[in-house]
């Protein structure tokens, strides 16, 4: 396969709301460039980009897919990203590896939440942005309504490049505002036709484009205003648009139909002439805050931005080359781990199909076999100590407990999940040793459902799914004194231990043990046995068997037998006193309270606060979000038992814009009205046997 240098490469991430036509546009781009012989459809399950069995089944993209096309001696690497919010890892991967983000929105639906989220993520990372209005062939498509919505939502940077001329809801031709020419299409082949009569609207759009271009250059600005809106040449417009897009001043808008190929050629021209090549950007951010400019040195620097785990083929690493040359079989250093690695094959991806490559240059994206690298790792040549900054992914906020349906698969579950977490950085896995549950975390119900289905399809493991057990605690609310006597006679040698202990609440999470024994009623050599008996007893409370915290025990008195007393007997006596004492000390249940940070739009604040109050939460405060421009951060404390489905609720209220993170903060007393239900559903445990 032909190799390309930085200047002749464009890396674009296709993003947008779920169902916005991204994958269909990608099919159109590949077909128009001659990379595929026939166009597939998401609905038919035969598109180039959606090839995973779960994607075909669900008819949505679950992860980032990579393909390429070649147009006028420029290679365009296309990263098709998921539009569903549960699969945001794919969006982050795609944007991190691209210089430009092309955001699709359907002509019928206009700006949606996914449109806004994709734009915000692109701008946050300093990427060039472009909008493509899709599905222009559909009935009731309305490009100009979409254009007004884009201007309202994203401001004056919006600049149409290709617009339709429609009549009675049907597109009759596509207008290239750079050329001021109109085209009709037959299977993607353009034919120039006479410009439509609506000249005033088109002249207004052209003048707005010229003004936007004028603002990118002082000389052009002077000419524009001195000559009362003087128009520019096509070359000046292209250069001005290119510069403005790179600086973030201009966001171009084109329109097309992925299915009929109308306007696809003009979209391709916009990509190669106006979007930046890798070497025109500020470069890749390094861990130390500096940037490595694409194509600025000969030594290899590359980053792994995506990993695919396959039980048969092994690991496939998607790599973006920043500098130098990556060659198959040539040793590299993994700067993240410090290990020497030898790449296997270099592959140029066309969905699931591959072409072998001997080498690839700065700015290009390839897949590599036999790398023991993870997503976010940096690969360099010997002597180059560059380490690239790692992408920050959304934190899991939806959790389920899983267990193998076939007990023989129990040992395989952890290994399978480990492979999946390598592949998807928004999945998490934890083995909770207290509740003895394997906890799988993700971004939502659909996310975990797809992960569990993948576990079955890829690794052959079927699992049971349940809600995680809440790790409650028990404590006491008043001081009591209790006695425990363990006396047992069997044959010659008996057992005897007798203690009197005071139990009281305290602030310490672990047991506080003291002794105030006078006169030797309990010999000192048995004090450790009493303490150990109490320590072991606190593993289970008297209400529901949960661990006991905030407990102080003071050994006051007791008695012993010179022959029958032993450490074991005093341990048992302490346990008896513990059970009797705690039952009389007004025992209570404590529930875990989480510190929750909700990021939301201002319009949803009232509804979210109502939800928090209904879930026994307390709002601590609100501030403008530092990371999400135009959003608000709301801090609250909410019981862990009340946040099980909070991710779904927040997403519904905020229309997908909002999200939350939670971390354990402290324990609080469970309201008495809820105790009976918790006790009834508490997991069973084995009684202390000494």
Residue ranges and their predicted role:
Residues 1-690:
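Structural and coupling elements of P-loop NTPases
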């Amino acid at each position: 396969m032909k190799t390309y240098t930085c200047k002749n490469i464009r890396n674009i991430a296709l993003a947008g709301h779920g169902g916005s036509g991204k994958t269909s546009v990608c099919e159109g781009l590949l077909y128009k460039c001659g990379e595929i012989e026939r166009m597939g459809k998401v609905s038919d399950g035969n598109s180039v980009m959606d090839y995973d069995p779960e994607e075909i089944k669900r008819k949505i993209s679950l992860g980032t897919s990579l393909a390429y096309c070649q147009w006028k001696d420029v290679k365009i690497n296309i990263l098709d990203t998921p539009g569903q919010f549960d699969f945001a890892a794919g969006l982050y991967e795609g944007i991190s590896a691209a210089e430009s983000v092309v955001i699709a929105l359907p002509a019928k639906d206009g700006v949606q939440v996914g449109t806004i989220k994709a734009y915000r993520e692109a701008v946050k990372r300093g990427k060039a942005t472009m909008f493509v209005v899709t599905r222009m062939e559909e009935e009731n498509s309305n490009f100009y309504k979409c254009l007004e919505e884009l201007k309202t939502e994203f401001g004056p940077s919006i600049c149409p490049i290709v617009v339709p001329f429609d009549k009675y809801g049907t597109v009759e031709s596509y207008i290239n505002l750079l050329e001021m020419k109109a085209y009709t299409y037959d299977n993607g082949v353009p034919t120039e036709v006479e410009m439509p009569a609506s000249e005033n609207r088109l002249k207004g759009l052209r003048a707005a484009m010229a003004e936007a271009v004028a603002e990118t250059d002082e000389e052009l600005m002077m000419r524009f205003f001195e000559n009362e809106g003087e128009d520019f040449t096509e070359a000046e417009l292209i250069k001005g648009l290119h510069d403005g897009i790179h600086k973030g001043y201009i966001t171009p808008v084109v329109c097309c139909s992925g299915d009929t190929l109308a306007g696809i050629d003009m979209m391709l021209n916009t990509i190669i002439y106006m979007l930046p090549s890798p070497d025109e950007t500020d470069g890749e951010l390094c861990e130390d805050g500096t940037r490595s400019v694409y194509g600025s040195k000969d030594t290899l620097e590359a980053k792994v931005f995506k990993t695919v785990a396959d039980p048969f083929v092994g690991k496939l690493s998607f790599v973006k080359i920043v500098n130098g040359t990556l060659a198959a079989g040539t040793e590299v250093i993994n700067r993240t781990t410090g290990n020497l690695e030898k790449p296997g094959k270099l592959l140029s991806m066309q969905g699931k199909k591959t072409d072998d490559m001997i080498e690839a240059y700065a700015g290009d994206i390839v897949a590599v076999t036999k790398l023991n690298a993870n997503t976010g790792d940096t690969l360099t040549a010997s002597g180059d100590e560059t380490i690239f900054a790692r992408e920050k992914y959304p934190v899991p906020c939806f959790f389920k407990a899983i267990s193998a349906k076939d007990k023989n698969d129990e040992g395989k579950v952890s290994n399978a999940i480990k492979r999946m977490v390598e592949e998807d950085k928004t999945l998490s896995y934890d083995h909770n040793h207290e509740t003895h549950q394997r906890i799988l975390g993700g971004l939502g119900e659909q996310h975990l459902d797809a992960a569990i289905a993948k576990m079955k399809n890829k690794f052959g493991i079927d699992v049971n799914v349940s809600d995680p057990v809440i790790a409650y605690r028990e404590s006491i609310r008043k001081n009591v004194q209790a006695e425990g006597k363990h006396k047992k006679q069997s044959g010659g040698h008996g057992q005897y231990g007798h203690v009197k202990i005071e139990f009281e609440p305290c602030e310490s999470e672990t047991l506080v043990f003291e002794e105030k024994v006078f006169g030797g009623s309990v010999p000192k050599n048995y004090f450790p046995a009493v303490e150990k008996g109490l320590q072991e007893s606190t593993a289970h409370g008297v209400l529901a068997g949960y661990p006991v915290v905030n407990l102080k025990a003071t050994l006051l008195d007791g008695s012993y037998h010179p022959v029958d007393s032993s450490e074991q007997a005093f341990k048992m006596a302490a346990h008896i006193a513990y059970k009797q004492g705690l039952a009389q000390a007004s025992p209570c249940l404590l529930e875990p309270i989480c510190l929750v940070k909700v990021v939301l739009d201002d319009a949803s604040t009232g509804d979210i606060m109502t939800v928090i109050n209904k879930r026994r939460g307390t709002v601590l405060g609100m501030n403008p979000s530092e990371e999400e421009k135009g959003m608000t951060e709301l801090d609250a404390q909410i019981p862990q038992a009340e946040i099980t489905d909070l991710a779904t609720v927040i997403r519904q209220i905020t229309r997908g814009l909002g999200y939350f993170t939670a971390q354990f903060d402290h324990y609080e007393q469970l309201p008495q009205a809820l105790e009976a239900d918790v006790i009834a559903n508490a997991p069973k445990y084995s009684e202390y046997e000494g």
